[in-house]
Regions:
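Generic alpha-helical secondary structure signal
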Residues: 87, 91, 108, 112-115, ...
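Thr-Gly-centered strand-to-loop micro-motif
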Residues: 77-79, 103-104, 138, 222-224
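Short pre-catalytic segments that frame enzyme active sites
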Residues: 1-87, 95-96, 115-137, 141, ...
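Short runs of predominantly hydrophobic/aromatic residues within well-ordered alpha helices
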Residues: 89, 101, 135, 145-148
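A penicillin-recognizing enzyme superfamily signal
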Residues: 2-29, 47, 91, 142-301
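Active-site catalytic microenvironments for nucleophilic, acid-base chemistry
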Residues: 36-40, 107, 119, 154-158, ...
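A small/polar active-site loop signature that marks catalytic segments
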Residues: 98-119
């Protein structure tokens, strides 16, 4: 199964709604950790020790809103074959290095990460707030694809979050236009944080990045995601005009891996967000933006 959601980066309009179910977002949630990292005065040029495996003891992470939450021991691994050591946050983002982001989380408050997520529309599938568990850094919760598309639209729009609306226009019986509901927009994060988040997420589309195959003749930014055993694969990406989330997984059988499945005539012995979600995103976006100009990212400075 696959779901594709697109959100107008300026107005919050939904381009292609297909339901509002929840799936683990995997590494696409790293963009939220990155935004909180930058919001708190850190830089994408700072270095972290991204080597793995790591095993975090209870109470390693700050959870100010729930101090009794032990959250450990928690083993963290990088993708097999990844050669990661001390690297910049930008490089950890480009390569989607798990241990790099858990090390970043040690310098943050998990509750502030969930608060930031809520401010840009990321909640559980039932609308309730995310649990302040450190595992959210690697996407250990259930969220709707629409929420992820709209959150990334906030990065594209200089920090402005607009609640998604499905109605583009209203016509009466005579064909006369009537006032359509407008998106409820707020400045969820300062423009500098949003722009630097967008700028850092551009790294994934560069050679050696997990989303290098998403490029279609214009600047793009985004983040791939793959959950344990490849039960969910994602790409959430944006241009200044449009943010789109692509999820591929098995919506009918919870917990069923995509490994060993035949998709489009190809049987995958391993599969990541870069394999199917990225090219699907690219093909959709290239058509959706065929008549729109190529703009820089960020487009606000």
């Amino acid at each position: 199964s696959q779901l594709v959601f697109a959100a107008d980066a300026k107005h919050g309009g939904i381009e292609l709604p297909d339901g509002n179910v929840g799936f683990q977002p995997g590494s696409t949630f790293k963009a939220i950790v990155l935004a909180e990292w930058l919001k708190t005065g850190h830089s994408a040029g700072y270095t972290v020790n991204a080597s793995a495996p790591k095993n975090y003891a209870p109470h390693t992470f700050t959870v100010s809103c729930d101090p009794k939450r032990a959250a450990g021991p928690w083993p963290v691994h990088n993708v097999a074959g990844t050669n990661a050591g001390v690297m910049t946050v930008r490089e950890a983002t480009k390569q989607s290095i798990n241990a790099g982001f858990t090390e970043m989380l040690k310098d943050l408050d998990v509750c502030e990460v969930t608060k930031l997520a809520a401010s840009i529309g990321i909640t559980k599938a039932d609308g309730s707030p995310l649990d302040p568990d450190p595992s959210i850094a690697l996407g250990g919760t259930l969220v709707p694809p629409l929420s992820m598309a709209n959150a990334y639209a906030t990065f594209a729009s200089g920090g402005k979050y607009c609640k998604p609306i499905a109605i583009d226009r209203i016509l009466d019986a005579s064909g006369t236009s009537m006032a359509a509901p407008s998106a409820d927009c707020t400045q969820a994060m300062d423009q500098g944080t949003a722009d630097e988040t967008a700028r850092t997420l551009r790294a994934t589309s560069e050679p050696g990045g997990t989303a290098k195959d998403a490029v279609f003749g214009r600047p793009i930014a985004g983040k791939t995601g793959t959950t344990d055993e490849a039960e969910n694969t994602w790409f959430v990406g944006f241009t200044p005009q449009l943010s789109t989330a692509v999820w591929i997984g098995d919506a009918t059988e919870s917990g069923r891996s995509l490994v060993g499945r035949t998709i489009g005539g190809v049987t995958y012995d391993k599969i990541y967000g870069s394999d199917l979600a990225v090219p699907m995103w690219r093909d959709y976006m290239s058509q959706a933006l065929a008549n729109d100009p190529a703009l820089p990212i960020p487009s606000h400075g």
